Amino acid sequence: MTRKISKREFMATSAAFTSSLLLSNGAVASTKYEILMLNKDPNNSKNKMIFSPHLLKVQVGDEVSFIPTDKGHNSEIIKGMLPAGAEKWRGKINKQVDVVFDTPGFYGYQCKPHANMGMIGLIVVEGDSMLDNLEEARSVKHRGKAKKAWQALWDEADAAGLTG
């Protein structure tokens, strides 16, 4: 025998279920991503010391794991390339670092030992205030091959429609 439920019961049950999902971890769903730290690009051996992917778009609450696939690398935020109120990170050499992104905006990161060789990357966290730190992040000065790598990365982000 099946019991018919009223619209009121259905709505109350649905609201309670949705609330429990939201309260359980702060988000209905989150995604985990991996960024590999590599000595060379498997698709183009001319590209050395890279993060793969080097440009990533995520949602608030998503997690990114920086995986030291090759030795001698780390991942850390670049000063001035972090949204206000966001948490900094600085991974140790040869160690995985996991970062949950709770603040919309642009996050520029690097491998400290290889930054001047152009080992940099950008994570764009979508949300209402995501453009708030764009100009500050773009204005950060870089040296060595990182300068050219950032120019190319910003061009790629622009072409992908990530910068407004």
Regions found by a protein language model. Give the residues of each.
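Extracytoplasmic copper-binding redox domains, predominantly the cupredoxin/blue-copper superfamily
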Residues: 2-6, 11-164
